[in-house]
Each structure stands twice: as C-alpha cells, then as structure tokens.
C-alpha cells in the first residue's frame, strides 16, 4: 500500500529583529548557503510531495533565492502579510496546498525556517512515528538542561502529550518541566485546518494565534497526540541573533569537515579549517591550518592547500601546492605551485606545472590587449 501524501509548510516570515540586519532572516548565510536551504534539506529523507514556504519580511528576496538555488523539490510560497502568530502562519501556508487535490488525506510537516542543524534522519523518524501510531499530531520534543524561553510539553498521568504551554504563559510547576517544544510537527492534514480555526489570540499573553494551542485543541477533542524526543537537542537550536548564527555555523562546519575526512581528505587541524558546504574536494587533498575554501571552489586530487590560504570560487587542479595565497574566481592548472604570498585576481589562470614564486599576482589576461 502506497504511503499517504506528505507535504510541508516552512515558516519563514519572521522579521528577525534580534539579527539587527537589512537581510531577511532566512537568507543569513551559514557555510556559504542561506539558512532556509538547510531546513529544506532536512526534508530529503521523507519523500515530500510539495513544500510551501510562508514568507513575509523580505518576501521578494526570499522567493528569488528559492527560484535560483532551491533544492530539487516542488516548492511554492505564500505571503503572510500580517504577523499574527505561528497559528496564522500555518493557516496561510495551508492555502498553498488547497489546489493540490492529490495531497488531500495525507500528512503535513510544519517546520520553522530558522533551524539549520536539523538532520534528515530526525524528520524521517518523526514522520515514521506519526504514521505508525496513527496519531492526529506528532511533535518533536527535546529534553534540555535549561528550558528557559521554550514552550513546555505538558503530559498527563498516562504519559501522553496533553498540551504545549509557552514560557510566558507557564505556571511555576510547568516552568520546571525540562521537555521543550521544538516547533516541529507532523499533522494529519484533515484535522489541522479545523483545529486552527478554533484558536484565539485572547488565550495567551502575546495576543497571537499560537500553533502550539492546536495540540491542546486536538487532545481535548479526543484525538491521539504523539511525540518523538530528539536524540540530539542541539539539532533543534534556532537562530535568532548573531551569536546563535555563529554557533550554528560552527556546528555545520564541523559536520562538513568531518564528512570530507570520511571521504579521504586530510585536515591537518580540523578546528582551524573553514569550508563552505558548496566546496568540492577530491581524495588525498591535504588542507593545512588557517585555510578558508569558499563558494564553488573545486580542488583536484592530491593537492596541498595552505597554510593561511583563502580561495573563493576557484578551480584548482590535481597535485598542486597553494600556500599563503588569496584567490577569487581563478584557475590553477595541474601540478602548479602557487605562493607563498600570492594573489590570484578574478579570471587569473595559472598554467599547469607553473611555479609562481613568492609575492606573485595573477591577473586576467585581456585577449584584446596590444600583445594579441
């Protein structure tokens, strides 16, 4: 029997005031990619039929990025014109699924657009648990040492999930709960929209439509509500300010470096190596400390990079040595030795086998110049 349809609603309409930036929050960059793309990546193990991104602040810039760089997934977007809370945002998101009759009767994932550390396996486990138990809603929770600021998961004597209470609305007893809501859910689509219509902004201190209140609405109506506790609470960390952005990027960089080492790349000092997620490295590349590889940089087999080298959108051949060099949009041929203290300007090409020597500056050769 085929699995029921699965759609996803990604909430990416918030202003992100604490970022203090003109850039829309979903477009802040981690390891060379906009944050929102990592959230979409988390859907990759779930066979999602369609994803709807709810946009708001900077909507045009966010949708432009999705059209140019979005993953191989059917993605639509809808705009939340007024920030009336997460419940309203999901209601807006569901309008992006109304014309997709093939998705009726299925399930819908809801994820925030600012959780770039989510792993696909975690979301897949959430969907599997939701379907195996037949729950109307299944939430991803986590147990943490300091739950301050998070909504608490309130369970009954039977151990089942009864409600989620936001931090500002919680009683003293509820504030002592260490199980938090991650704002990540899987809902039976047929019950979600009716439950959203029962929300009231008068029921909470913020005067907003809380998506979290849907859990209590469903429980009180007799629907089963399930949960999955995240194995790694760090996965669900949101990015709300520059410090959290730096922490998330550090973890993504650690994963990226570890992944390349597992594929045959030597990192002499992993903690002092900085790789964008968009970089491509061949086997037996050696990266020395203080090296930054960014953008669409590609490095061939057996090449040594660094120390103290930064390459952005560069193509480096096999068996090269590039040390103490700064390069952008340049090419280095096989077997070339570049540096130390070299600069490769955009368009520069170092021929195969060249030894540039120290203090070299590579420039774009103009084919229309006097020597041509």
Model-predicted segments: where are they?
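Catalytic cores of nucleotide-enabled group-transfer and carboxylate-activating enzymes in metabolic
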Residues: 6-7, 48-51, 69, 94-95, ...
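Conserved core of the sugar-phosphate nucleotidyltransferase
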Residues: 60, 118-204, 212
């Amino acid at each position: 029997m085929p699995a029921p349809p699965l759609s996803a609603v990604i909430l990416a309409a918030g202003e992100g005031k604490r970022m203090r930036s003109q850039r829309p929050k979903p477009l802040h960059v981690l390891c060379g990619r906009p944050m929102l793309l990592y959230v979409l990546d988390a859907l990759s193990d779930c066979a999602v039929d369609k994803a709807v991104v709810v946009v708001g602040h900077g909507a045009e810039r966010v949708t432009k990025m999705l059209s140019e760089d979005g993953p191989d997934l059917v993605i639509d977007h809808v705009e939340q014109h007024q920030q009336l809370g997460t419940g309203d945002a999901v209601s807006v998101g569901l309008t992006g699924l109304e014309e997709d009759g093939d998705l009726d009767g299925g399930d819908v994932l809801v994820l925030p657009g600012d959780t770039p550390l989510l792993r696909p396996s975690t979301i897949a486990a959430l969907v599997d648990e939701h379907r195996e138990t037949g729950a109307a809603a299944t939430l991803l929770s986590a147990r943490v040492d300091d739950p301050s600021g998070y909504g608490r998961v309130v369970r009954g004597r039977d151990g089942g999930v009864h409600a989620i209470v936001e931090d500002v609305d919680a009683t003293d007893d509820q504030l002592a709960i260490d199980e938090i809501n991650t704002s990540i859910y899987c809902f039976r689509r047929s019950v979600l929209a009716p439950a959203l219509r029962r929300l009231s902004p008068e029921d909470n201190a913020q005067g907003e439509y809380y998506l979290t209140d849907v859990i209590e609405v469903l429980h009180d109506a007799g629907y089963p509500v399930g949960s999955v506790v995240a194995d790694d609470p760090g996965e669900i960390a949101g990015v709300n300010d520059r410090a959290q952005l730096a922490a998330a990027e550090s973890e993504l960089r650690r994963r990226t470096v570890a992944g390349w080492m597992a594929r045959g790349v030597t990192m002499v000092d992993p903690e002092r190596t900085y790789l964008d997620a968009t970089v491509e490295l061949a086997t037996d590349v050696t990266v020395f400390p203080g090296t930054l590889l960014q953008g669409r940089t590609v490095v061939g087999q057996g090449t040594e990079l660094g120390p103290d080298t930064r390459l952005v959108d560069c193509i480096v051949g096999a068996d090269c040595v590039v040390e103490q060099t700064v390069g952008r949009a340049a090419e280095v041929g096989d077997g070339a030795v570049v540096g130390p203290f070299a600069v490769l300007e955009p368009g520069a090409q170092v021929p195969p086998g060249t030894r540039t020597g120290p203090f070299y500056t590579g420039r774009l050769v103009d084919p229309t110049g006097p020597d041509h």
